[in-house]
Amino acid sequence: GFTSFNVIRYTDDIEIKDSTASRNDAPDLLYILYRYIIVFKGFRHEMELVALDRDNEHADIERIANRINNNNFRTYDFHAVGGTTSTLTDEQHRENIRQGIKHCRRGDVFQIVMSRRFEQRYTGDDFNLYRALRSVNPSPYLFYFDFGSFRIFGSSPETHCRIEGNNAYID
C-alpha cells in the first residue's frame, strides 16, 4: 500500500496546500492485506509466490503458477502524446530546494524530499513504462500497484548500499 504526503494533515497540525491533482482519484492512504503476493527479484531474474492463506494454499498456488507459466500475456505499446508539463517552473523548484536547505541548516528537519510533479499524456500500457523504468533504474525499491481505478508505480533513486572496489558503503 501507500501513504501520500497529504496524510500529514491528519497526523500533525500543519497547514499544507492540497497537492492532489483534480483528476487524481487515489485516496490519501491505502493498505491492503493480500492473500497472494508475487515478488519479483529483478537482480536474480526470479519470482517468488507468497501465500498468506494456509487453508487452500497448494491448490491456489498451483493455479496461479500455471497462469504465470502460461507466458501468453497481452502487451500493448506505450507512446507519449504531446509534451511534458509540471506543477512548478524550474526556478520555483530551485527556490523550494533553497528553502529546504535553510530548514536543514536551522535544524527544523533532518531530511527533506523535494518532489516535483510531472505529467505526460500517453497511449498504451503503463506497465511497459514500469518495465522500462526497471531496466534503466534497477532500484531494489521498485513498485507497481494496480488498484483497478488507479495505478501507482515508481522507484527510489537513492543508494543505500554501494560497493566500490573492495569497499562497501552504507549511505
Locate predicted features.
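Extended alpha-helical targeting/anchoring segments
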Residues: F2-D171
